[in-house]
Amino acid sequence: PICVSPAVAILLAGRTVPYYLGRLVHSRINSYLCYAPFLNAEQTMNRIILIGNGFDLAHGLPTSYADFIRGYYIIQKLKLLEGESELNDGLCSAEISDSEDQRAMQQFRWLLKDGMFKFTRGCGENTLTKNYDRFFDKISKYESKFFEAINKAIETKNWVDIESEYYSWLKKLYKRDKCEYTSPVLLDKDLEMIKAYLITYLKIVQQKHFQPELKKECIYQTICEPFHINDIAYGNRKEFDEFLTARFEYLTTENEAEIDCFLQQFGQSHLSWRSDIDLYKDSIRDQNKQDALDLSKHIKKVNDNKGDVPGCFLLPDQILLLNFNYTSTADLYVTKGSDFEINHIHGELDNDKNPIIFGYGDELDDDYKEIAKLNDNDYLKNIKSIRYLETDNYRRLLSFIDSAPFQIYIMGHSCGNSDRTLLNTLFEHKNCVSIKPFYYQKDDGSDNYIELIQNISRNFNDMRLMRDRVVNKSYCRPLVPAGC
């Protein structure tokens, strides 16, 4: 198709679309402009994919905090095997101080072979490996009380949220409640050390495991799937009907080249849909009006959940992948020729212009309000809302959600309190029409849907709104279904 300049396209559209204007600088202008005459903020409907650590885990990446702590100790144990006799990095220390310890170390040398450490995930069945673990525990000790608490949480619960743990300690410090730290500066120093190790660990994971083959077709199809009437909140059906009307007019009046521009970002074409569209048109003609297409019939079919409505009538206008991870797994789903956007809201590995944000973000908590009154900036150093101002990521997110109604897909994000401020902004926004969680299903058939909903509820002040917007389990499914 022949596409015009951005300025001319907007003039032709005759509408104000501030978000899309901002995107022209860094999006694929060609596919955007072909769709420009259709862009009306009041009649479009977008989708935000909320991506958390469970998304990386679903792709087989060892990126949980428990994996990270395990990796940290692998590195420390490796240093001893390679000949170091004393370790102390501020988090933990270990010392081989006598001849008995030196003799014990000799029997573990076989764990090193050709410079490679044989102690890896899944090797715990080896007796000598277990003995080395016990030996390391005997000669090591914690140098950081905060790091010790993280380890004990993993030992007792088999998981930990380091950011939530940090905020708990910050509150204990503020309340002078049996806190081993005398100043937030000391606590922040330990957090910075942990953050540095975490970044190093994730870089290793990404370098070793990241590859295009990780992309799962079932997840990609879910990201790009059509809207479903059962997912839309009752309080937002008016906006959904406006979207249906605008999309109907577009697909039934524009030429094929224009429609192709829109469908290409989903990896589709008008040719693939043409026969379905033609058949569908025949089913909604009004015989009393010279076979004109009847919009009301179309809207009724969608609202009645009739299966013969072609999916192209229900595809989102824009898709934003909101990535809370530091890794690049989400980038696999921004395909060539797509106009979808990705926002690494918490920073990226190896990108100085988008630094890692690691801390806590719950301004709705009563204790936070008291901490803010202390007039002590050291307490606010790792509060996410402040760190967001280091880049334009948060501002771009606000621009997106203000531009048009949107649905939220939750993929691998626990929706815990460490991101409560941002999630509340999304979930209670006037343009949010639906929140659909994709849960984790265990091998025994159980799942974490209820736990996820409980976490989501804490991000709402208005429970009535929550019950309307969150999609019930009948219409939800696992992030990675069996066989995917």
Mark where each language-model region is.
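SIR2/sirtuin-family catalytic core signature
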Residues: 21-59, 65-68, 81-99, 338, ...
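Short Gly/Ser/Thr- and charged-rich N-terminal loops/segments
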Residues: 12-15
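Acidic/glycine-enriched edge-of-secondary-structure segments
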Residues: 366-391, 402-417
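N-terminal regions encompassing targeting/leader/pre-sequences
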Residues: 1-2, 412
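Extended, H/D-rich, highly charged conserved domains that either
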Residues: 95-385
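Short linear segments in intrinsically disordered or otherwise low-structure-confidence regions
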Residues: 2-4, 8
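Extreme N-terminus nucleophile/cap motif
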Residues: 77
